[in-house]
């Protein structure tokens, strides 16, 4: 999803569980991008959730901004930040998703995981133009840490549009496998039975190695090989590149 945005954009990333791995990967894969990582103090306790995490990032987002949840991919161009909008995709299972009712391209009603909801699902991608309204709505209506609490009453925003996008969900194992099949496993991510994963970003290969002793031995070997390996070899606590 990072590749969908201009390189000069700033990315505010909330991190918690496995946050070090997220930070290390982003910095290896996108060394020229500007990232700000916000460590969330409550990732699994009472009232934790995407909305709570977003509020921890509030001070960095006092201007129009995009929201992208970590399990959302799209096979569409990134819409412009030209107003308040939600990315949507048709669904037959309103009980599984936050859904919206439309009048043309205007969002007029919202429902959260209700079998009596609507046929357009919020995909986890949004443009927030009236950020003051967003923060006010989130703080006033947040339930169980949900970020979608900010969209409970669409009429509280000056305008709220829908953007229909080709959504690739990765929020559960079945959808993740479908997405990998759809993308032909691109960008390359070769996962082994030992939980190692190799990623490819541009011309850079990045290997995630959860076994610390294996990783340390590879780093030692790379140093001993010296000039026999590429001179841009890098390593972190979880990766080699």
List where the protein language model places each region.
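Conserved alpha/beta core of the MobA/IspD/sugar-nucleotide pyrophosphorylase nucleotidyltransferase superfamily
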Residues: 119-195, 200
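ATP-binding glycine-rich loop module of kinase domains
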Residues: 191-221, 230, 238
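Short, aromatic/basic amphipathic alpha-helical patches
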Residues: 24-29, 218
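N-terminal glycine-rich phosphate-binding loop and ensuing alpha1 helix
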Residues: 1-22
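Conserved beta-loop-beta/alpha segment of the NTase-like Rossmann-fold superfamily
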Residues: 27-104
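Short beta-strand
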Residues: 160-162, 231-236
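A cross-family kinase active-site recognition segment
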Residues: 241
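Conserved core of the sugar-phosphate nucleotidyltransferase
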Residues: 74-147
């Amino acid at each position: 999803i990072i590749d969908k945005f201009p390189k000069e954009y700033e990315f505010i990333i909330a991190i918690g569980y496995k946050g070090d791995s997220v930070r290390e990967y982003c910095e290896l894969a996108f060394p020229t991008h500007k990232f700000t990582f916000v460590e969330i103090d409550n990732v699994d306790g009472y009232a934790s959730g995407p909305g709570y995490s977003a509020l921890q990032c509030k001070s960095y987002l006092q201007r129009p901004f995009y929201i992208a949840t970590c399990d959302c991919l799209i096979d569409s161009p990134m819409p412009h930040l030209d107003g308040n909008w939600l990315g949507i995709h048709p669904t037959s299972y309103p009980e599984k998703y936050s859904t919206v009712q439309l009048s043309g391209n205007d969002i007029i009603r919202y429902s959260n995981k209700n079998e009596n909801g609507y046929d357009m699902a919020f995909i986890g991608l949004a443009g927030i133009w009236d950020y003051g309204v967003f923060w006010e709505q989130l703080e006033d209506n947040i339930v169980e840490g949900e970020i979608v609490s900010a969209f409970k009453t669409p009429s509280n925003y000056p305008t709220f549009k829908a953007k229909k996008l080709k959504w690739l969900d990765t929020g559960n194992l079945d959808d993740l496998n479908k997405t990998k099949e759809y993308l032909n496993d691109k960008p390359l991510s070769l996962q082994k039975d030992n939980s190692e994963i190799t990623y490819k970003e541009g011309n850079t290969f990045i290997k995630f190695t959860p076994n610390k002793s294996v990783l340390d031995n590879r780093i030692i070997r790379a140093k001993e090989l010296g000039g026999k390996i590429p001179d841009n070899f890098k390593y972190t606590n979880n990766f080699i590149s």
